[in-house]
Structures are given as C-alpha cells and as structure tokens.
C-alpha cells in the first residue's frame, strides 16, 4: 500500500522537518522515498514527490494494518502542505519493482547521510541539469531505522540513503553530463557519513575505497594482497591509484 504527495520546493524544508519527527513512529516495513522530479503538469518546473510505501507481504498482514502504519503520515501536516496527494493506494509488489526496458548511458554516486537537508543543498543545481537527461534522485528517509541484526552482513553508514543515478542518451552528451554530475557530487559529498562504495568508484575515485576501512583493516588487506599478488597483476580493487 502506498500514499504519495507532491510539494512545491518552497515547503521542502518543512516536509523534511515533519519526516524527521515522524522517524519515532516509523515501522521497519515502511519505506519513505523523497525525490526531486519534473512537475508532471509542467516539465519546466521542479517539484518534490514523497512516497510512503508499506511492504505488507508477510502472512497475516492486512490492508487495515497497512492503513494503520500510514496513518501518522496522513494525520500530519504533509497533506496540508501538498499540492496533490493520493492516499492508501493498493499496489502490487511486481508493479513497485517494475523498470522499463530502456537503454541509457549513466553515471552513479550514492551516499549515506545523517542529514536529510542534503536534498535541499542540490535544488538549484538540479535545475541546471542538461536537457534530455534524467536524474533518478531519491532520498530514502530513515532507511537505517529498522531493526539492526548484529549477525547479518549488512553495511549502512548513516540514517538516510541518497541515491542519484544520472541517465542520458548519446556519447556526444557524455562531457556535459559528467561535468554537471561531478559538480552535483561535490555539493553532496560534505553531507556523506563515512563512505558508500559506489559501482564506479574503482574507475573514477579509487582512493575513496580506502575510506571504507579502518586503518587496521586496510593494512590487513594490503598484507594479504602483497602475499598473493606481489606483482599487482589483478585489478586494483583495493583503491591503489
């Protein structure tokens, strides 16, 4: 089940403040996704879209229970701040995960952060995005507030996850998009908590990988590498420039 809201950018600070306060009642089955998008009614205007999704796919879960989990958001000031809203929509998990089969060139750099206001810092730069490009920018608010299982191998270095894959068409647009995206991440990176190893870090920022380890563990990995790969024949996945 899902509730969604559209907001003008001038109320975005208030929206983030409300969501921060609602973290106290956030259930681990509830996903909060706050994104910057082009207004469906006016592509020249940027708006904020909030989706609150309850994944109720366990035995015994019901629509009534899902509505109960969504109730704190419906009863907050989110509704009065929004320009439009759709409440308690029943959706299928397959539809939620569907992605159109499209081919794009891309760049991607995600961060963990404890400050949801990171989204505010990039609003003006977002408006300067190259034409015909698509930034799937989304803040997973309170991603790391669920039950933490100490026996699980799971890495999360902050309260919120900010994902920002950039998509575009044509190799002739590579330079413009990569330059714009580099500036975007220079704005975002000061908000990062520790470091999230991204899919392109080995190519673009190999030294960042070291930031993901304590100095002690980094030296252990270096020792193992020197033992089994003394001639450095393998890819420098450990972040050596």
Residues covered by each model-derived region:
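Soluble FAD-dependent oxygen oxidases
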Residues: 1-241
């Amino acid at each position: 089940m899902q509730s969604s809201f559209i907001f003008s950018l001038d109320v975005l600070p208030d929206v983030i403040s409300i969501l921060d306060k609602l973290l106290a009642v956030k259930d681990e089955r509830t996903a909060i996704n706050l994104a910057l998008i082009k207004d469906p009614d006016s592509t020249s205007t940027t708006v904020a879209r909030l989706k609150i999704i309850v994944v109720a796919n366990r035995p015994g879960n019901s629509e009534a229970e899902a509505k109960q989990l969504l109730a704190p958001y419906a009863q907050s000031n989110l509704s009065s701040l929004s320009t439009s809203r759709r409440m308690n929509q029943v959706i299928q998990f397959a539809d939620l995960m569907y992605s159109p089969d499209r081919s794009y060139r891309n760049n991607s750099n995600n961060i963990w952060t404890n400050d949801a206001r990171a989204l505010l810092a990039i609003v003006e730069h977002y408006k300067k995005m190259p034409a015909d490009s698509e930034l799937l920018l989304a803040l997973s608010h309170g991603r790391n507030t669920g039950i933490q299982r100490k026996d699980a191998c799971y890495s999360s270095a902050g309260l919120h996850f900010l994902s920002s894959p950039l998509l575009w068409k044509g190799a002739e647009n590579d330079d413009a998009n990569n330059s714009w995206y580099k500036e975007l991440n220079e704005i975002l990176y000061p908000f990062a908590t520790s470091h999230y190893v991204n899919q392109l870090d080995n190519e673009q920022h190999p030294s960042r990988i070291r930031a993901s380890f304590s100095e002690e563990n980094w030296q252990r990995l270096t020792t193992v590498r020197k033992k089994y790969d003394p001639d450095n024949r393998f890819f420098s996945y450990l972040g050596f420039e």
